[in-house]
């Protein structure tokens, strides 16, 4: 199936789940078909021992972190304990895109960049400005940046629910192998703003990685670790929206 066929079927309303089964390139082809998406080097998610990470081992609402596509750009991976369907995510520049929903056997697993699109605060190893907040009362699960209280709905493609963030949180595109219960990161949906992030965090990243080249090194395998092990000082703050 080529890109034109893929887009034609998507426009005709063919289910995304079926398309990803039909398309040989799966999620990677889906990313390339989006107007607001970026593909990067494909990276297998692995555990600390280097073995393929099994998505079914994720417990509900316990966040994990993996660096992708660069050594210095952490993402948050979490089981939200609910099946998530595709949604249309609106962008201020008009380059809206289709978020494919959750992955995994229960379609309940999502991954997003931890870099806030407002001022590029993130889940740094020394201070976790961006974190995951499990559902509470009538509020669903959120990712929140405690720097300026931007809140993002992880069940709806990372759309903004509160705070000054100008657009949705970029979602990691995960290609899931159901037979092996493994996943590959293949790119991002939305605008991850990596160039802006590296400029804003230049000195801090040099302190962590010694050189910009090391910070920007692309990963071929993405090691998944608990959020609590990645970030020495997590932050908590009110959840807006």
Report residues per predicted region.
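N-terminal secretory signal peptides and thylakoid transit peptides that target proteins
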Residues: 1-18
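Hydrophobic membrane-targeting alpha-helices
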Residues: 18-26
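N-terminal pre-ligand scaffold of iron-sulfur
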Residues: 28-132, 176-241
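Short beta-strand-alpha-helix junction that forms the catalytic/metal-binding core
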Residues: 106-112, 136-145
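Polybasic, low-complexity binding patches
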Residues: 129, 136-141, 154-186
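Detector for the c-type heme attachment site
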Residues: 119-121, 147-151
